[in-house]
Amino acid sequence: MLSIQQRYNICLMAERHPKWTQLELAKWAYETFQLPKIPSQGTISRLLARKSTYMNCKEHEKDANRLRKPNNLLVRKILQEWISQSLWNGIPITSPIIQDTAQAVWHRIPAEHREGNGSFSYKWISNFLSKMDVNISVLDEELPKTPKVWTFEERDVLKAYFSKIPPKDLFTLDEAFLSYNLPLDYAQYEASSIQRRIEVATVMLCSNLDGSEKLKPVVVGKYDSYKSFRNYFPNEPNDPVSQSMLGTKMAKKFDISYHSNRKAWLTSNLFHNWLVRWDKRLVAVNRKIWIVLDDSCCHRIINLRLQNIKLVYTSSNSKFLPFNWGVWDEFKTRYRIQQYQALIDLQNRISKNIQNKNKSERNECIPNGKKCLISFEQSQLTMSNAFKFIKKAWDDIPVDAIKANWKSSGLLPPEMIHLNENVSMAFKKNEVLESVLNRLCDEYYCVKKWEYEMLLDLNIENKNTNFLSTEELVESAIVEPCEPDFDTAPKGNEVHDDNFDVSVFANEDDNNQNHLSMSQASHNPDYNSNHSNNAIENTNNRGSNNNNNNNGSSNNINDNDSSVKYLQQNTVDNSTKTGNPGQPNISSMESQRNSSTTDLVVDGNYDVNFNGLLNDPYNTMKQPGPLDYNVSTLIDKPNLFLSPDLDLSTVGVDMQLPSSEYFSEVFSSAIRNNEKAASDQNKSTDELPSSTAMANSNSITTALLESRNQAQPFDVPHMNGLLSDTSKSGHSVNSSNAISQNSLNNFQHNSASVAEASSPSITPSPVAINSTGAPARSIISAPIDSNSSASSPSALEHLEGAVSGMSPSSTTILSNLQTNINIAKSLSTIMKHAESNEISLTKETINELNFNYLTLLKRIKKTRKQLNSESIKINSKNAQDHLETLLSGAAAAAATSANNLDLPTGGSNLPDSNNLHLPGNTGFF
């Protein structure tokens, strides 16, 4: 059997003689290693298939016959990082300290990465240090020596040293953070909700002095595989192994080196492996090189054994590396130019598509040259886009720019560098590129533009140079195989110990809830539920954009009002081109109704999909939708934009949704709402019949009335006046429909604490009474039986039936919920400490605690679902007051005119005027 050393040498010969056949390699191995027989062609083939593994093996592994996976691999990686930076910073460490640190690290890592019981013996520590080439017997007495770190004042010594090195063999490298999906609308960047969604990747660049060798960029992301990678490999299997390999295939496609960890940081382990791999190839061609780098934490390696690479460390505080003198600014400038060009291209395509569509329909609402705003979801780049832009930006940096930066750094004698033009020793920027970037900043239509100088000096793009904490070391060592799917609803059992929140159960509502849809021409109707997890954040973003309209550096939005308004109106219903925009569009709302017996559709001032905002994935798109036509798709799949029938009227419109305060009112927590309702507990509680339909009607009415104080307010009509007109008109209500005042008070109290509606099969005939006493135009979608007579149940009877089947007091429910939450948090803390061996508990006790903990989670989940189903019903105390006024007036009218009300027998006979409407053509029921 071939040893690791022999396999490594065969791989070296394959690197040195790429034209050799596998048979020639086998003969060479037979003669060189004095083997008993010639290795077979299959043996050489399998060996070369794992060439990267054998080329990256460490010195202590070469004597073995096979590579074995060590136990507690993650602990070893973290401990190696910790020991390296401790020794580098002169912190004394001993074997007992290393043992305690290893045990602490073992308890910090996730349970799936743990092996053994967390106990590390002296022998284990000794073997571990020997693989790092650290003698444990000497470690207790004297720290290993670290490499020399050169300061800026010592650069004259470096000049004399570097003057003896051939320019092609003198390299430099440096890394920096790159916020690859940075929003180029500064108003979006200022929104804290969007800042949390900005992703950062680490990019390392390396080149020699004369620019003849520019190594492929090293990129470190957060996941081994991103969802966007499937744009280039759509036919790959969906199993976890194939999914995790997409990152390697993407790196090979774009000719970059890709790695990942949770922090997206370049660690010393990754850097060490990268150096070892390069050193093996240099040994194969018998070439020696020198690398100039800084002493940041990711470069700190102890006892690095490299044969053909010499590292020259400089102080990271002085920042006199060549790349700091202009290469990084030029790289970022070229990256942002590509990003701006892609966004401007998307805006132009949308505008051109809509203009062509208008011409075909003889609609000239958008003047030529007008553009539309693009939301953050449409403008953010993915990692696959970043790969493409990073590679192109690095390849486009000219050789003279690299030479000029070497000369400006002052590390080399002037005679070593020959340029086509004189370059001063001062810092020199690429003024041509910066002028292009500045022009694109002005050309891109947005709420508030970036200053191009700020784009090159972001705080989030400053790399780490300090001592890393243990928690940071743990996070930077864990590798996540695949990017999580944020579009799916969270699972109910996903509870975090450190931040226990019952809101994780909010997405598990039953699907029998009515889907409320409101439409208005000035708000985006394409609020798709598959992107609903970002709904609230998008609302804050729109609010942030509005607040910046008056900024001095912002674009003039008023110049494009006509285009934006047209886009907003055009997106209400693409299939319906007629009708008054101010009137309810019933046809556009038919598709939003669910299959319940009685469906309620209310025409309001806000286009909000409540189930979408609650992350209810009831309408997952199977085909490409408007949100699929974004800048990322334009970069990865430009063919999607070539269809002549493509309609982009619903794409890229950054609609001005209501402010975040509106949603906080509509979706306020059940606790706050029930505290308001608790003040009415002293009222009588006469039991009334139940009706699911009117319970739903009450919830919609409550949500509608709650929005009256927002940016586009509408007032609540005077119900007493309306009902008094009804009594004056000569019509009367049947005495069987009369409701006592105690019952009305009971309804006011209990309507804020309904836990669940009973009798879902009841289908009352929905009728609304207008100011003249005649039934209003039907807004409730359930058909009215043509055979019904005047004795049919009236609207008041339906309203009376909405309050039966009440759950226990809302105060009691919420009190029990809060108690369960507190107990669950306490049990979670206890089990966490027990798992870390901070407290000693028997196995039976831990099992009992775990059983109780899971039982509490189920109770919390059930209660949370119960409260969430009524969250829209109980949001407004003011709505309850108006409803009480309505019912009180109705009861008074019923007492005086009991048998004079004649209702029509068919929905087609309903009159078209004098509806009970809210201002803004919005029906109350």
UniProtKB/Swiss-Prot annotation:
SUPFAM superfamilies on file: Homeodomain-like
SMART domains tied to this protein: CENPB
Basic and acidic residues bias: start-end ranges: 674-686
PROSITE patterns: HTH_CENPB
Matches recorded under InterPro entries: CenT-Element_Derived, DDE_SF_endonuclease_dom, Homeodomain-like_sf, HTH_CenpB_DNA-bd_dom
Segments of skewed composition (Low complexity): 538-563
Name of protein: Protein PDC2
GO MF terms, alphabetically ordered: DNA binding; RNA polymerase II cis-regulatory region sequence-specific DNA binding
Domain HTH CENPB-type per the UniProt entry, residue ranges: 63-138
Region Disordered, annotated ranges: 510-596, 674-693, 904-925
Described function: Essential for the synthesis of pyruvate decarboxylase. May be important for a high basal level of PDC gene expression or play a positive role in the autoregulation control of PDC1 and PDC5.
UniProtKB keywords: DNA-binding
Comp. bias regions, Polar residues: 513-537, 565-596, 904-916
Any one cellular-component term (Gene Ontology): nucleus
One Pfam family linked to the record: HTH_Tnp_Tc5
Disulphide bridges, residue numbers: none
GO biological process: positive regulation of glycolytic fermentation to ethanol; positive regulation of thiamine biosynthetic process; positive regulation of transcription by RNA polymerase II
Keyword DNA-binding: yes
